[in-house]
Amino acid sequence: MELRTFNAMAPLHVMHYQNSSIEEVADWNLFRRQLKESKKMGIDGISVDVWWGMVEKDGDNIFHWEYYQKIFSEIISNGLEIIPILSFHSFDPGPNSAFRAPIPNWVWKYLAEKSGLNEIDLKYISEEKGKDDALLYSDEFVSLWADEWVMPQYSEFMEEFLREFQNDLDSFQEINISCGPTGELRYPSYSSHDGGSYPNRGRMQCFSKPAIQNYREYLKADSFIHPSELISELEKGNYSDHGVERLLKWYNLSLMNHGNRMLKECIRIFPETIPIGFKIPGIHWKIADPETPRIAEITCGLIDGTEMNGEGAYSNSLRMVLKDLPLERIILHFTCLEQNNSDLNSDSVKHFSRAKDLVYDVSSASKNIGIKIKGENSLSQNLRHEEAWFRIQSAIEHGNYSGLTIMRLNDVTFGNKLGNQEYSRIIRQF
């Protein structure tokens, strides 16, 4: 039987940036204690966000690796492996946050110059409009329709990372690549900047100039209907309408092709001994909505609405994202292992969630395609409930999951006694 891996996520950033050296020392001391406890529990590795917005914040090709030299050294010295996440997405809760890592300011200016577009058109623009018809956009991730200009920047970052940590490669369990907001292959359809959020349907994100131009090219000689004219049919769940069907196929294909480009670059740059991982989110609400089934997954770009069976829908998408790639090198990470289905009595309250079904559908899809899948929890607060741990255990035992990553380290060490006990028990069992 194949060995499973049991990992935990490091904090977003060790130390709080409040100009207190005492606080910094305390944070690093706590992190060291967490690492020692992790090793004792049998945890294999620690995943670490390598923030683009931190490393290259000062300008093109000006890299700051000191923090990562330190944190990697701490992890290795405790006998643990590292799972670097090349985090090209933004983490920016706002100016008063203890830690921020927005996409570097210079990136938007650089891409605008290269492309001839304005900065807003390099971002995902929503179907929704603001006051006085203002465009609503997300700057969590550079739009996939700007890949032509931003991909060389991603490649430079990867190559520089490889040079900097050449001597640590043996300690890398795998390298993960961020393909969208929060590091996941998706559109920012529920990021709350435009009214799209859990548990509603989400918002389509294909209204920038390069997106519309790309859609026109996709249609070729077929008649063009602007996406804004199709939203009302989408909201009715009329996915088989000719215009809606074409739009959703293109929308899903565009995202999967973007994921393929990102993975292809990783495969090209990093040694073949290192597996490459990517993540898709568990968009579990609205799956069983009788009027608009699976609409939240559709606006997120994960599926195209032609196939309502979860296993089939995700098999179709995975085939696209993994086209012409060496499957033996790639690991899919999927979130929401700890969540349950809503039932018929609670469906309207729990938003027609089929989280548990989705966990098994996506694992079956990965098995169909022939790639390894590992799981994650989606919310740390769920780890305070025993039944969540039983669902995680069941997914590993009866699903196709070959590993688990818990978000975050504190939730299985000193911040959650139940989490510490249950993760230790699961690791011992497997």
Please name every model-derived segment.
Residues 19-25, 58, 87, 94-99, ...:
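Short, solvent-exposed loop/turn and secondary-structure capping segments
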Residues 109-323:
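Polysaccharide-binding and catalytic clefts of secreted carbohydrate-active enzymes
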Residues 24-34, 62-71, 148-160, 254-264, ...:
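Well-ordered, non-membrane alpha-helical segments in soluble/globular domains
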Residues 11-15, 51-53, 87-91, 177-182, ...:
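Active-site beta-loop-alpha junctions enriched in small/polar residues
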Residues 1-38, 49:
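Boundary/entry segment of secreted carbohydrate-active catalytic domains
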Residues 3-9, 45-47, 79-85, 172-176, ...:
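Structural preference for beta-strand elements that scaffold enzyme active sites
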Residues 81-83, 87-91, 310-430:
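Substrate-binding cleft of secreted/luminal carbohydrate-active enzymes
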Residues 28-125, 152-169, 173, 193-196, ...:
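Aromatic-lined substrate-binding rim segments of carbohydrate-active enzymes
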